[in-house]
Structures are given as C-alpha cells and as structure tokens.
C-alpha cells in the first residue's frame, strides 16, 4: 500500500511522468501500427501489380514460343528440301 508523504505513485510529479510516458508509449505503438498497415497495403498492391505484369510477360512468351516453333519447322523443311527455296 502506498504511504502518504510524497512517496510512490501518489506524488503528482510521478503521476504526471507516468501519464506522459504512457502517452508516448501509446503514440509509439500507434505509429508502429500505422506503418505496419501501410507496409501491408504496399505489399498487397505490389503483389497485384507483379501478378499482372508476370501474366502479361507470360502471354508474350507464349506467343514468342509459338513463333519459334513455326520458324523451327520452316528451317527443318528448308534443310530437308532446299529446292523449295530456289
């Protein structure tokens, strides 16, 4: 039990210091929480953008692979039957 006479948390100065420290801690925690939310939002946007760009690149790669297959067939035909191109 706290004794009267200015000792312990009953002292107005100590209470003021404790309240100020509590507010500083709450502000710090609030800032951390806000920054974590911002980071999370950024990561969600980054994931969506990255998925979209990768899907676009995948489509372009598929088109290039098909074109390459056609060219390989044409080269193969030209090598086995060169008279077609003369």
From Swiss-Prot:
Subcellular compartments: Cytoplasm, Cytoskeleton
GO cellular component, one term: plasma membrane
Chief place of localization: cytoplasm
Alphabetical list of InterPro entries matching this protein: BRICK1
GO MF, any single term: identical protein binding
Keyword set includes Endoplasmic reticulum: no
Gene Ontology BP terms: actin filament organization; cell motility; regulation of actin polymerization or depolymerization; trichome morphogenesis
Top-rank taxon: Eukaryota
Keywords: Coiled coil, Cytoplasm, Cytoskeleton
Chain segments annotated as coiled-coil in the UniProt record: 47-81
General function of this protein: Involved in regulation of actin and microtubule organization. Part of a WAVE complex that activates the Arp2/3 complex.
Subunit structure: Binds SCAR.
Family: Belongs to the BRK1 family.
Record-given protein name: Probable protein BRICK1
Organism listed in the record: Oryza sativa subsp. japonica (Rice)
């Amino acid at each position: 039990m706290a004794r009267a006479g200015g000792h312990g948390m009953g002292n107005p100065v100590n209470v003021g210091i404790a309240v100020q420290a509590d507010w500083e801690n709450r502000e710090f925690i609030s800032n951390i929480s806000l920054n974590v939310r911002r980071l999370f939002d950024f990561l969600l946007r980054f994931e969506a953008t990255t998925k979209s760009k990768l899907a676009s690149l995948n489509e372009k790669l598929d088109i290039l692979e098909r074109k390459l297959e056609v060219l390989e067939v044409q080269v193969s035909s030209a090598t086995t039957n060169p008279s077609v191109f003369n």
